[in-house]
C-alpha cells in the first residue's frame, strides 16, 4: 500500500537535457516501492534521508526500502526531439520550445512517479532555465530569481491532481491576457501569433461563466493558460490550468472560416469542461476514460448552444458525435463504452468515437429521459461529493438517480457494458403499432442482445414515451394510426426502420429528425437491409433541402459512394451537388456558409468542369472569402497538378489553418508521384509530424493515386509503423490502419485482407478486424446494381 501526498520537483535545464531532484512525501508499508520511470537516468535514491538500493527494469524504478516520510530521487532526463509524447521538443521557424503531453502514461518519461490517475498528489515545481526563456506550468509563478547565468521559476503548489495533468512548457512564448475577472486567462503562442488568439480568450471567458453557473462551482485555480503548441499529437489536452492545443484547434480570427471558429470553440469548451470533470474530479482508472471524454464532449455542445445559438450546436452534436458513434458501434469489433483496461498500453485504443461520441450521446439520451434540471442537479451533487478526488461511472449514476428519485443505474449499465445498439423496426396495422428491436450491425449478423431503450415517439401528433426492455411490444390506440415518427429530436442512440418505408414520411420531421432518418437509411443500405433504390428515393425527396446538416450529410454519403466506385456513382453525386449549389450560393447565415463550403468542395472533386471554372479564383486566393478557400485550392490542384506552386504557398503561410488547406489540396492532385513527394515532406518535417496520419488518410480518398499509396504503405509498413508510433503514439497507427487500408481494400480486397492478417499483432488486432469489416461492407456497395 502506497500513500502519496506531495511531489517537490526541481529541474535544471541545459537546452534539451535536464537534471532533476524530486522529493516525494509519501508512505509505504511494503519492503519495496515501485514507481513508473521510462528513459530517465536514475542517479541516487534516498528513503527517509538514507541512500537505498534501487534498479530500473520494465518501465519501473524499483526502490528496495520501506518509506515512512520521504523518497528523494536524483535523476536526469532529456526532451525527445523525435517524438511528440512525454516531454519533447516542438520545433518552429528555426526555433523550438519544450513542452509536455502526459495522457495517458507519459508522465513517467518526465519524472519518476506513480503514474496512475488514482494516485493524486500535490505538485510543487521549480525550474532553472537560460535567461530569455519563459516557463509555464499548471499554477501561477510565485517567484523568479537570478541564479548565476540562469533564472529559476518557482510555481505555486497545485491542488491534489493526477500525474497525467501535470504540465511544463519552456520557450519564447508570446502572451496576451484577460484580467477582467477571475480567473486570469492567458493565451500563449509562438512569436507573432498571439493576436489570432483574441477570439479564443473571448470564447474561454464565456464558457467558464457558463460552467460556473451550470456546475455551481467556481473554476478552482487562480489562472488559466491556453497554449498553442507547434507540434502536438492530440487536438488539445486538458492539463489543469495549462491547456495545450494544436494551433489549428486554438487560433481563429475575423479571417477564419465559420467551420474553423466552430471547431476552435468546441475544442476550447471541451477542454474547459475537463477542468471540472476530469481534473477536479478524476476517473479512478482508465476503464472510465469514457466518462471523462464523453462528459466533456456533451458539455461542450451545451455551452455552445448558450453562447452561439446561431450555430445550432445540438445539430452539430448529432452530426459530428452521434452519427459517427452509431457508425463505429455498428461493427462486430466495437467495444462497450466501459472497457476493462489491464495493460496501460491498451489505453490509447480507447480514445475513439465510442468513448467520446457514444458516451456523450448516451448522456444526452439519459438527460432527455430524466429531464435537464434533474440531470444538472445530479451532476452538481456528484462534483461536490468527489471534489479533488476520484470517482467512477456508478458514482455519477447514483447522483443522478438521487436527483431523479428513481434508480437509473440499470438503464445506464445496459448501455455502458454492452457493445452496440438496436435498430427499432416500426410496424403499423390499423390502430396498432408494434416496435421490434434487434442489434444493428453493418454485416447484418443475427444477435439476440436486448437493450433497455428509452423510446420517444409521436402517434397522430401526440408525444409518447416507452421503456422498451424486451424484444417487441405492441401498442393499441383509440384511432387508426395515420402518422408516426420515432426517436424525437434524435435523442435516442438507436436507428429506426419503418415498415413500410413510406411511414417515414407520415409525420413532419424537424431538421435533426431528417438528418437522423437519412443517416439511418444510408446505414441500412450499407448493411443490406434496404435497397439502393429505396435509398435514392429518399435522397431525391430531399434534393432541394435547406437543412444545412442534412445537405452536408447527404453530400458526405454520396462522396463515400464516389470514393468507393467513382465511375458508378459519379453522376448521382454530381447531380445532387449541382442542385444544392443553387440553394446555398448566396447564403448569409453561418450554417448556410458551412453547407456551401462543403458542397463546392465535393463538387470540385467529382466534376472536372466545375473544378476548372472554380480554379480560376485561385489567382485571387488571399482576397477570397475564407469559407470557400479550401474548395478553390482543391479545384486548382485537380485542374493544374501544380505541386510546386501549392507547396510554395504552403511554406509561405504562417497559420496552420491556411497550411492545412494547402495539404488538402495537394492530396487531391491526380498524379501518382505525389505519394512519395508527400511522404518525404512528412519525414523531413516540412509538413509537421502531427499531420502524418491526416496526409495519408486524405490521399487514400483520392482514387487516382490510391493504388500507388497502397503499394507504398504495404511495401514500407514496418518503417511507417515505427515512424508513426514514435512521433504520435499508437493512436496514429490505428488511424492509418482504419482509414487508408479500408480504401486499399476497396481496390484490392483479397490482397489487402491478406496483408492485414500478416501485420496483425495484439496491439492493433481490433483495428485490423474493424478494417476488414469495412472492406466487406464497402465491396458489397461497390458492386450494387443501380
From Swiss-Prot:
CDD domains: M1_APN-Q_like. Its EC number is 3.4.11.-. Pfam families: ERAP1_C (PF11838), Peptidase_M1 (PF01433), Peptidase_M1_N (PF17900). GO terms for biological process: peptide catabolic process; proteolysis. Its main location: cytoplasm. Belongs to the peptidase M1 family. GO terms for cellular component: cytoplasm; extracellular space; membrane. The active site is at 271 (proton acceptor). InterPro entries: Aminopeptidase_N-like_N (IPR045357), Aminopeptidase_N-like_N_sf (IPR042097), ERAP1-like_C_dom (IPR024571), M1_APN-typ (IPR034016), Peptidase_M1 (IPR001930), Peptidase_M1_aminopeptidases (IPR050344), Peptidase_M1_dom (IPR014782), Peptidase_M4/M1_CTD_sf (IPR027268). Keywords: Aminopeptidase, Cytoplasm, Hydrolase, Metal-binding, Metalloprotease, Protease, Zinc. The gene is ape1. Its cofactor is Zn(2+). Zn(2+) binds at residues 270, 274, 293. GO terms for molecular function: metalloaminopeptidase activity; peptide binding; zinc ion binding. The record marks 356 as: Transition state stabilizer. It is found in: Cytoplasm. Substrate binds at residues 103, 235-239. Binds 1 zinc ion per subunit. It comes from Sulfurisphaera tokodaii (strain DSM 16993 / JCM 10545 / NBRC 100140 / 7) (Sulfolobus tokodaii). This is Probable aminopeptidase 1.
